[in-house]
């Protein structure tokens, strides 16, 4: 009980000798005592603050995640909560250290610090993935892989679940059944329409870079969606520097993937839906 009270009243530490004044055997009730452990910011309020922080962080999950600004708001709230949690952890650790009560909680703090380091390393890896994809989407989405292609107008980066043999990109035109927006979709993720597609796409992961070449284009599949274009890509087994593509006029050739895209800004000669 004494240990609990010492922790709960722990704050800015001021140690003074304990003494009792005006004490007499006949009247001990009216004695004045000086407590050796003074707290200007009680440790108990830190516990309440952490509890409120956890509630606030959990409540932020009710934010709708349909738009990019909503995703950015949610991730921003999570980042602020994590920073506050780190501050509270360090502050409480320093208080316990000043009160010479660190030993009882050393393993708990070690676990907290390890989790914080893992979270920080993950944030650094997501930033590195943003650099690889030339997009901020890896910071907004929790996917481990991203399908990317780059045009003169826009850098596309769509979350993906895993490395597969085939990638299908659905392009809507606003009249699809079921209703789709005018964008590119892969699974449940989408990217607004800014430009066309290329003859190849790349799946980026933390330590993954897999190239896919456009194999065919279909206007309908067995998915039930109509008035949509499906771009079907197959994994490349050849060297990345020698990609065989088919140009618009039907000829074929060997080009470097770093060249300008075949399906870029829409023209009357491309097969990209307007």
Curated annotation (Swiss-Prot):
GO terms for molecular function: monoatomic ion channel activity. It is found in: Virion; Host Golgi apparatus membrane; Host cell membrane; Secreted. Exists in both O-glycosylated and non-glycosylated forms. The glycosylated form is associated with the virion. It is a multi-pass membrane protein. Keywords: Apoptosis, Glycoprotein, Host cell membrane, Host cytoplasm, Host Golgi apparatus, Host membrane, Ion channel, Ion transport, Membrane, Secreted, Transmembrane, Transmembrane helix, Transport, Viral ion channel, Virion. Residues 1-34, 100-104 are extracellular. The chain crosses the membrane at residues 35-55, 79-99, 105-125. Residues 56-78, 126-274 are cytoplasmic. Residues 33-141 form the CoV 3a-like viroporin TM domain. Its main location: virion. The record marks 133 as: Involved in polymerization. One of its GO terms (cellular component) is host cell plasma membrane. Residues 145-237 form the CoV 3a-like viroporin CD domain. Glycans are attached at residues 27-28, 32, 34. The second or the third transmembrane region are responsible for Golgi localization. Bat coronavirus HKU3 is highly similar to SARS-CoV (SARS-like). Forms homotetrameric potassium sensitive ion channels (viroporin) and may modulate virus release. Up-regulates expression of fibrinogen subunits FGA, FGB and FGG in host lung epithelial cells. Induces apoptosis in cell culture. Down-regulates the type 1 interferon receptor by inducing serine phosphorylation within the IFN alpha-receptor subunit 1 (IFNAR1) degradation motif and increasing IFNAR1 ubiquitination. Homotetramer composed of two homodimers linked non covalently. Interacts with M, S and E proteins. Also interacts with the accessory protein 7a. This is Protein 3. It comes from Bat coronavirus HKU3 (BtCoV).
């Amino acid at each position: 009980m004494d240990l609990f009270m010492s922790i709960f009243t722990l704050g800015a530490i001021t140690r003074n000798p304990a003494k009792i004044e005006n004490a007499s055997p006949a009247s001990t009730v009216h004695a004045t005592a000086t407590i050796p452990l003074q707290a200007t910011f009680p440790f108990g309020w830190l516990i309440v603050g952490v509890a409120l922080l956890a509630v606030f962080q959990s409540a932020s999950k009710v934010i709708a995640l349909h738009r990019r600004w909503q995703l950015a708001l949610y991730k921003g709230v999570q980042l602020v909560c994590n920073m506050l949690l780190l501050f509270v952890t360090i502050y409480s650790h320093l208080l316990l250290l000043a009160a010479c009560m660190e030993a009882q909680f050393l393993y708990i703090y070690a676990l907290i610090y390890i989790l914080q380091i893992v979270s920080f390393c993950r944030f650094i890896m997501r930033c590195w993935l943003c650099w690889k994809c030339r997009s901020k989407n890896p910071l907004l989405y929790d996917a481990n892989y991203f399908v990317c292609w780059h045009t003169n107008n826009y850098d596309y980066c769509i979350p993906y679940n895993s490395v597969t043999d085939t990638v299908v990109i659905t392009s809507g035109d606003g009249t699809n059944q079921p209703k789709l927006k005018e964008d590119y979709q892969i699974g449940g993720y989408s990217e607004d329409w800014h430009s066309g597609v290329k003859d190849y796409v790349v799946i980026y992961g933390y330590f993954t870079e897999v190239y896919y070449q456009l194999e065919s284009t279909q206007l309908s599949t067995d998915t039930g969606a109509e008035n949509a274009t499906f771009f079907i890509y197959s994994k490349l087994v050849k060297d990345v520097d020698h990609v065989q593509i088919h140009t618009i006029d039907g000829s074929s050739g060997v080009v470097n993937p770093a060249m300008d895209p075949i399906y870029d800004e829409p023209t009357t000669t491309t097969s990209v839906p307007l």
